[in-house]
Amino acid sequence: MTGSLWLSLALSLAVLAQFKVSAAPNLVCFYDSQGFQRQGLAQFSMTDMELALQFCTHLVYGYAGVNADNYEMQSINKRLDLEQRHLAQVSSLKERYPHIKFLLSVGGDADTNEGNQYIKLLESGQQGHRRFIESARDLVRRYNFDGLDLALQLPRNKPRKVHGDVGSAWKSFKKFFTGDFIVDTDSETHKGQVTALIKDLSAALKQNDLLLSLTVLPNVNSSWYYDAPSIAPSLDFINLGTFDFLTPQRNPEEADFSAPTYEAVGQNRLGHYNLNFQTEHWLLQRVPANKINIGIATYGRTWKMTKDSGDSGMPVVPSTQGPAPAGPQSKKEGLLNWAEICSLMPNPGNTNARGPSAPVKRVLDPTKRYGSYAFRAADENGDHGLWISYDDPDSASSKAMFARVRNLGGVALFDLTQDDFRGQCTNDRFPMLRAIKYRLL
């Protein structure tokens, strides 16, 4: 074959490779296995799972944990994972869905048995790393998963404080010279340990043709812990937790957009609390765009409004009192799943409702830059006030377009069990998942 023919073939293959990347973006579906144990309308079945898998390219089972004593990866719900064989039940779906990659995730803020076991793992040296790597590979292989998702539970940025203009000016000065409020004085050492762990873990998994992905949890400072240029070659893809920038647990006294696409300027907001900043950070670190998946949540964050919060609902909302009461399905303070949020929107069934069942006022974002919110001002007694920041199918679709236009790897959905998987709102099952998939096509 002549040199010109070789060159022509090489160029053709390069074009085809680019087309393949752009034509088949990732839709990484996280599955919190706790959903299988919920009751009533919140219970997520294997039938629900199979419907969702029509839209996913990857299914990530959450979550395993780390034994703080010996640094081995282990189940944190042995009754469900092992005794009821739910791990095997989920991975067995590979037979019917061979085009989907099934990964097992470790960490993900679900491993609450020990406060700092992930830092201990990093500091455990080669012997501790080896125990973790061998146990992780064994667990992944034993239950026939295609790889491992590493969702390290590392120290978080300190939340934004509420203060006036003078405090804001001092904060900006302090941040410029000292960074984003240091929470880990050994972060540079830990960054090197993370790099070593990822490289060794990747090498071990590759021996068995297993995948390795990294999930960067919300409010973990990527620049502290991840040497992006060094670890990117060892990772198949990276899921960015680009949501929960503000939550009622971290920011109880004021409510604001929890997952904006772009910076919402003014009012003492921090410039890195948005999807665009986090994505650009990784791109500027020379990480290939097609390895980056942006995260979208299927739930909203909810604050309790008081009489002092006013009645406009316009963020930033002052004088909130932490998390709003839990929803009837999700049963977690400060959080409502998409079906619960949708049920609070004005509809024939709640027109005359009062108290906690009264409808909320929905405020859309026509710019698609910051996100939608909904609220119910507190009544004359100061009760039943509610403020919700959320993504809906429209804004999720817009974020998927963000990924597509920038030639990113795709989207990671957190998670399937918080979507309206029963179609309670509009009879459309998995509306968030579908909206993202259709935009990525």
Curated annotation (Swiss-Prot):
<dbReference type="InterPro" id="IPR017853">
    <property type="entry name" value="Glycoside_hydrolase_SF"/>
</dbReference>
<dbReference type="InterPro" id="IPR001223">
    <property type="entry name" value="Glyco_hydro18_cat"/>
</dbReference>
<dbReference type="InterPro" id="IPR015520">
    <property type="entry name" value="IDGF"/>
</dbReference>
<keyword id="KW-0732">Signal</keyword>
<comment type="function">
    <text>Cooperates with insulin-like peptides to stimulate the proliferation, polarization and motility of imaginal disk cells. May act by stabilizing the binding of insulin-like peptides to its receptor through a simultaneous interaction with both molecules to form a multiprotein signaling complex.</text>
</comment>
<dbReference type="InterPro" id="IPR050314">
    <property type="entry name" value="Glycosyl_Hydrlase_18"/>
</dbReference>
<comment type="similarity">
    <text>Belongs to the glycosyl hydrolase 18 family. IDGF subfamily.</text>
</comment>
<dbReference type="GO" id="GO:0005975">
    <property type="term" value="P:carbohydrate metabolic process"/>
</dbReference>
<keyword id="KW-0325">Glycoprotein</keyword>
<feature type="disulfide bond">
    <location>
        <begin position="342"/>
        <end position="425"/>
    </location>
</feature>
<dbReference type="GO" id="GO:0004568">
    <property type="term" value="F:chitinase activity"/>
</dbReference>
<feature type="disulfide bond">
    <location>
        <begin position="29"/>
        <end position="56"/>
    </location>
</feature>
<keyword id="KW-0964">Secreted</keyword>
<feature type="glycosylation site" description="N-linked (GlcNAc...) asparagine">
    <location>
        <position position="221"/>
    </location>
</feature>
<dbReference type="GO" id="GO:0005576">
    <property type="term" value="C:extracellular region"/>
</dbReference>
<feature type="domain" description="GH18">
    <location>
        <begin position="25"/>
        <end position="441"/>
    </location>
</feature>
<dbReference type="GO" id="GO:0008061">
    <property type="term" value="F:chitin binding"/>
</dbReference>
<dbReference type="GO" id="GO:0008084">
    <property type="term" value="F:imaginal disc growth factor receptor binding"/>
</dbReference>
<dbReference type="GO" id="GO:0007444">
    <property type="term" value="P:imaginal disc development"/>
</dbReference>
<dbReference type="InterPro" id="IPR029070">
    <property type="entry name" value="Chitinase_insertion_sf"/>
</dbReference>
<dbReference type="InterPro" id="IPR011583">
    <property type="entry name" value="Chitinase_II/V-like_cat"/>
</dbReference>
<keyword id="KW-0217">Developmental protein</keyword>
<protein>
    <recommendedName>
        <fullName>Chitinase-like protein Idgf3</fullName>
    </recommendedName>
</protein>
<feature type="region of interest" description="Disordered">
    <location>
        <begin position="309"/>
        <end position="331"/>
    </location>
</feature>
<keyword id="KW-1015">Disulfide bond</keyword>
<dbReference type="Pfam" id="PF00704">
    <property type="entry name" value="Glyco_hydro_18"/>
</dbReference>
<feature type="signal peptide">
    <location>
        <begin position="1"/>
        <end position="23"/>
    </location>
</feature>
<dbReference type="GO" id="GO:0006032">
    <property type="term" value="P:chitin catabolic process"/>
</dbReference>
